């Protein structure tokens, strides 16, 4: 019995190796324990040998056909092919099921909810003024905070110059005011020798020159590049003369 089972195992292994390598093998291997050559032995011959007299166990079922049919020789090959397909995980492993490639491609391309090629939405002004009848909105919360002071009247930036109690809502306004105490004139006219404490005063003065051109004020040194100095001037008419420098505090 063990010799017959071993012979069937060797035959199945031969078929698997033949299918995987693409060759056709028509001979069998000798069985172990001196079983002798097994050339031309098929599955039915092995079953008849296993059911020889004197072997305990139920008799084997009768064959389906008296003679070898056209598909009898191909039956072991089909069985081996199905086993090999199961081992390889091919399409025969799960008939009727979706292949792993199709399922993975379907899972890797979910609907994004946006039309292909659509550009992302631009940044919106999400910081809106909460005061009624004010529809202003800003990109940054710091800009909104500065705007809210126009409603509340808050002026947290106070001048620390001795004898000056002025306060401002913005730090750049305080810096510009501080130059009125120090007498600093950072903005020089590119067409003459005059200097000014504010960039808008320089612009008004420079326009009076016959050869004035706006590009002259964009040169380095002609006007400051600080954004705080680009605010519109609240004074009308010709620029007022700069005040004389105040005496420095006694503690300095």
UniProtKB/Swiss-Prot annotation:
Residues 55-65, 240-252 have a biased composition (Pro residues). One of its GO terms (molecular function) is RNA polymerase II cis-regulatory region sequence-specific DNA binding. Disulfide bonds: none annotated. Residues 25-74, 90-128, 204-252 are annotated as: Disordered. Coiled coil: none annotated. Transmembrane segments: none annotated. InterPro entries: Znf_C2H2_sf, Znf_C2H2_type. It is found in: Nucleus. One of its GO terms (biological process) is regulation of transcription by RNA polymerase II. A zinc finger (C2H2-type) spans 127-150, 157-181, 187-209. GO terms for cellular component: chromatin; nucleus. Keywords: DNA-binding, Metal-binding, Nucleus, Phosphoprotein, Repeat, Transcription, Transcription regulation, Zinc, Zinc-finger. The modification Phosphoserine is found at residue 99. The keyword ATP-binding does not apply. The modification Phosphothreonine is found at residue 152. It comes from the Eukaryota. Residues 96-124, 230-239 have a biased composition (Low complexity). The keyword Iron does not apply. Its main location: nucleus. PANTHER family: KRUEPPEL-LIKE FACTOR 16, KRUEPPEL-LIKE TRANSCRIPTION FACTOR. Transcription factor that binds GC and GT boxes and displaces Sp1 and Sp3 from these sequences. Modulates dopaminergic transmission in the brain. Belongs to the Sp1 C2H2-type zinc-finger protein family. This is Krueppel-like factor 16. It comes from Homo sapiens. The gene is KLF16.
